[in-house]
Design a protein with these regions (language model features):
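Alpha-helical scaffold segments that flank or form the walls of functional sites
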Residues: 26, 74-125, 129-148, 178-194, ...
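N-terminal metal-binding scaffold of metallo-dependent hydrolase/deaminase domains
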Residues: 1-44, 55-56
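C-terminal cap of metal-dependent C-N hydrolases
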Residues: 13, 394-451
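Active-site gating loops and adjacent loop-to-helix segments of metal-dependent hydrolytic enzymes
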Residues: 72-103, 158-174, 236-263, 283-286, ...
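Metal-coordinating catalytic core of metallo-dependent amide/deamination hydrolases
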Residues: 133-271, 275
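Divalent metal-coordination and catalytic microenvironments
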Residues: 7, 25, 30, 54, ...
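His/Asp/Glu-enriched, well-ordered alpha-helical/loop segment
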Residues: 256-263, 305-404, 420
Length: 464
């Protein structure tokens, strides 16, 4: 049993969105048992006590889209100023040099960085398996470091010789892809409430595999009760390619392939029209909004407030560590808030320029941004047991000291300070009732030798 108490502000994100001054809660066997003002609770004999005076406490953040292996190729000079397709063409040959240790080590580095940003649930999309690499390498890292993990078994089957972008040596044969999807589901997927590990079927995109594999992936995932994930509508180049190749827009093409329903979520969804947003809401699809990556690659601004008004499930993703190039979920929530405000201003400018009436939509608030990073991500991942500090929820929570320089002058609204002020690292991170960050330090990983090994692998890959 763990008793967390005396938080300066406990942000529950429960159904009533309670924010409790002097709040506390009880954790039993990895679950939140009770929540309220700290004076409500008596400390039971033998219980561990976590004193959180002077801290703001929030639910653990949820990352709905990532490529952890890309921590190995951050800020590569030739890829720094490229758009998506040029960026991929530059990095694919480097990624082709990865092996099992590269996948494992990069996953540990990315997960460590995410934990130190307040992220407790990570969904990663691994779609390259060169030189004997397997999804198992990431799973091993997640189990060692202690994060809650959704492992997306990605795939690419169309190499350069078939009109695709990746080198032929990194694509797989489609029967082998399907067999391995079944293997990892049967070996790793845990559908139970409180699960620490789930598996997702996730072709890289509808343009990097055949239409047949997209359809077979739907059948396989639904027969095994797992979710489906892919990239969609990220760039204008993609939209043009889809219309030229298939005679329809990306969303319509995905729906034609069976990629529609509450078990489906897409990464990005930047370039959609007014007719497609209600369709996504009606079918229950979710999306991972990746603001930093979309800005980094000049892909565009996703209409997040339009999605929210329509009732589409929206979570946040830091996306590839080589298209971000960081792993900071609190920063991603801040970026989402600021980019939504920029989109609002641009929509207003365009309306005035065309003489159209502007509805005067409101700006995204700090509390809405935090909701995207918690409950929004939980909904996208099909989870009802994470995203809030409430009885019956998983004991995943994060605490930040408020007496630091970055929050000076911002104590009147500590929650807003988290989003408006410079993003900070947490002092405490707990996942499944287990302390993984204490006093700002990781408890399960020795960082210096890990970083040294990671940098050595990175140099070897980049230098060839």
């Amino acid at each position: 049993m763990l008793f967390a108490r005396n938080a300066e502000l406990l942000v529950t994100m429960d159904e009533e969105r309670r924010e409790i001054s002097g709040g506390g809660f009880v954790v039993r066997d990895g679950w939140i048992d009770a929540v309220g003002p700290s004076e409500m609770f008596a400390v039971e004999p033998g219980a561990a006590v976590l004193e959180l005076g002077g801290h703001i406490v929030i639910p653990g953040l949820v990352n709905t889209h990532h490529h952890l292996y890309q921590t190995l190729t951050r800020a590569v000079p030739a890829a720094q100023n490229a758009n998506l397709f040029g960026w991929l063409k530059t990095l694919y040959p480097i990624w082709a040099r990865m092996g099992p240790d590269a996948i494992y080590t990069s996953a540990l580095v990315g997960m460590a960085e995410l934990l130190l940003s307040g992220c407790t649930t990570i969904s990663d999309h691994l779609y390259m398996f060169p030189n004997g690499a397997r999804l198992d390498d990431e799973v091993r890292a997640a189990q060692e470091i202690g994060v809650r993990f959704h492992a997306s078994r990605g795939s690419m089957s169309l190499g350069e010789s078939q009109g695709g972008l990746p080198p032929d040596r990194v694509v797989e044969r489609e029967p082998a892809i399907l067999r391995d999807c079944v293997r990892v589901i049967e070996q790793f997927h845990d559908p139970k409430p409180g699960s620490m590990l789930r598996v997702v079927v996730a072709p890289c995109s509808p343009f990097s595999v055949s239409a047949g594999l997209m359809r077979e992936s739907v059948d396989l995932a639904r027969s095994h009760g797992v979710q489906l994930h892919t990239h969609l509508a990220e760039t204008l180049d993609e939209e043009l390619f889809c219309q030229q190749q298939f005679g329809r827009r990306p969303v319509a093409y995905a729906e034609e392939l069976g990629w529609s329903g509450p078990d489906v979520w897409f990464a990005h969804m930047v370039h959609v029209n007014a007719h497609e947003i209600p369709l996504l809401a009606q079918t229950g699809c979710g999306l991972a909004h990746c603001p930093s990556s979309n800005m980094r690659l000049a892909s565009g601004i996703a209409p997040i407030m339009d999605y929210r008004r329509a009732g589409v499930k929206v979570g946040l993703g830091v996306d590839g560590s080589a298209s971000n190039d960081g792993n900071h979920m609190l920063l991603e929530a801040r970026q989402a808030m600021l980019l939504a405000r920029l989109k609002l201003a641009e929509d207003e400018r365009q309306a005035h320029a065309s003489g159209a009436e502007f509805a005067g939509a409101v700006q995204m608030t700090a509390r809405e941004a935090l909701e995207l990073a918690t409950l929004g991500g939980a909904a996208v991942l099909g989870r009802k047991d994470i995203g809030a500090i409430a009885p019956g929820m998983c004991a995943d929570f994060v605490a930040y000291k408020l007496d630091r320089l970055a929050f000076a002058g911002a104590r009147s609204d500590p929650l807003a300070a988290l989003l408006f002020c410079a993003p900070q690292q947490p002092d405490v991170v707990v996942v499944n009732g287990r302390v993984l960050v204490q006093d700002g330090q990781l408890t399960m990983v020795d960082l210096p030798p890990l970083i040294e090994r990671h940098n050595r692998i990175s140099r070897e890959m980049i230098n060839g």
